[in-house]
Every structure is written in C-alpha cells, then in structure tokens.
C-alpha cells in the first residue's frame, strides 16, 4: 500500500476577510486519497460559498462510491441546477489509488498544474476558462 502526507492552506487577498478558495484532503473508504480544490472566482462570501459547495459535492459523491466520471457529471449537473446569473468556479480533482499507485487529475475550468518528477517540472492540463454556474454544460473536464 502506498502512503504519504499532504497538507494545504489558503490565504485571503489583501483587505479581504474571506477566501474564495476551498480544498479538501483525505482518504476514501475504498483506499483512494483525494485532494479536491475549488476556486470560487473573486473573493468574499459568494466566492467562498460557491467553492465550498463544489468541494462538498465532490466529496459527497466520492464518499457515496461514485467513480470520477459520475462524480464530475453529478457535480456539473447540480451546479447547473443551482446556477443563477454570472457565477464562476473552478474544480481540480486529484485521486491516488493507495493500493496500485495510479493517480488521476481532472480539471474543470482550472489553471494548469505541474508535476514534479525526478527533478523535472512538467505541465499537466488546464487552460480552459472557468466554468459558469448554470452554464457548465459546455465545459468538459480535462483529464491527465
């Protein structure tokens, strides 16, 4: 079985009391490690609410046994139903199977990520615009 450690943190922009980013790190019952990150575009209460809802929906679906595609489809659908006006958020979903060592990274509207391996930095996915709540049907998850 694979193992490791993870940590995270968030920081408000200067002058703001609330951060619009939310993350969740943990292990699922099926032996996978999950790291979920959402950036509720902007800052303040609305951005924080949107990013928190996205991460909570991801975790609820994964905890219920949904696979990656089902989870992203369900979150996409729930955000479509909840969408009102011009609301944007991004999602990064990293899953590591602690039994096999296989990992996946799915991105919805998120900026590119980087993989450090053997001292080399390689770009991974990204480049799509942020997803608009109520308009996710045209956004597809990029996977790496």
Spans of features found by a protein language model:
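N-terminal entry segment of metal-dependent catalytic domains or homologous docking segments
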Residues: 1-40, 46, 53-56, 114
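Short, mixed charged/polar active-site loops
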Residues: 3, 33, 103, 121, ...
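Acidic loop->beta-strand submotif enriched in PP2C/PPM serine/threonine phosphatases
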Residues: 16-31, 91, 123-144
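Active-site-proximal, acidic helix/loop segment immediately C-terminal to a metal-coordinating Asp/Glu
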Residues: 42-64, 128, 132-135, 144
